[in-house]
Amino acid sequence: MEAEGLGWLLVPLHQLVSWVAAGAMVFGGVVPYIPQYRDIRRTQNADGFSTHVCLVLLVANILRILFWFGRHFESPLLWQSIVMILTMLLMLKLCTEVRVANELNVKRRSFAATDSKDEELRVPPRRPYLDFDPHHFWHWSSFADYVQCVLAFTGVAGYITYLSIDSALFVETLGFLAVLTEAMLGVPQLYRNYRHRSTEGMSLKMVLMWTSGDTFKTAYFLLNGAPLQFSVCGLLQVMVDLAILGQAYAFAHHPQKPAPHAVHPASAKAL
């Protein structure tokens, strides 16, 4: 009788817990970027944050959304991808505005060739629409160029998915690429820290949140018997996170001053 009497309470409580868990799944992934966003706004310096992190997450979440059309998964994971894409675009917008404001004589980089009389005296001849030169790609001076690049990638990937949606091999490969790309999340930051021999400007809170979140996620995969690629990619993410934390410790205790050299507009940009 007592158990039956509590039934009316347990059902809505279970529903509430499910809603909270779904909300945490949707918005939890963007929490690590809040302190980094606030630090950039406060200091007006984005040199410590690698915008290639945004590139990795944009590609991973676009692929995950396309994967959903071939193999439906839980709605919170789909909404998580949408929220993450919007968050990364906001991060790119802020970083672009801050860097352009701080670079008075920067040579503008553009994803799409456009005619502008105001820029003719400031820039060399325009590059092709798709400029995948590693020295210039993803180093543009206008947020609109990043948006155009994201839309172009989404359009091409979406069209290929539309043509191959009936192939189980393609759909599974698409899902694997989405997970593997996300596993590479910390690599741009790891490389940026190594290249500059410094973690100055990087939010340690962000990396700690990465590590705790990836550790929890990987443990969940292992304990619940998730597909092997999920567990392997999760372990790889944790290893990269720990490597970044190791860099923060090493560079803080053994700082290395870079040799003086002439600053070139293209090389002055952080990854």
From Swiss-Prot:
Gene3D superfamilies: 1.20.1280.290
Subcellular location: Membrane
PTM annotation (Phosphoserine): residues: 110
Keyword Transmembrane helix belongs to the record: yes
Topology of the protein relative to the lipid bilayer: Multi-pass membrane protein
Transmembrane regions: 7-27, 49-69, 72-92, 143-163, 168-188, 232-252
Coiled-coil zones: none
Main location: membrane
Keyword Transmembrane listed: yes
UniProtKB keywords: Membrane, Phosphoprotein, Repeat, Transmembrane, Transmembrane helix
Signal peptide: none
Gene Ontology annotations of biological process type: phospholipid translocation; retrograde transport, endosome to Golgi
InterPro entries per UniProt: PQ-loop_rpt, SLC66/Scramblase_ANY1
Name of this chain's protein: Solute carrier family 66 member 2
Natural source organism: Rattus norvegicus (Rat)
Gene name linked to the record: Slc66a2
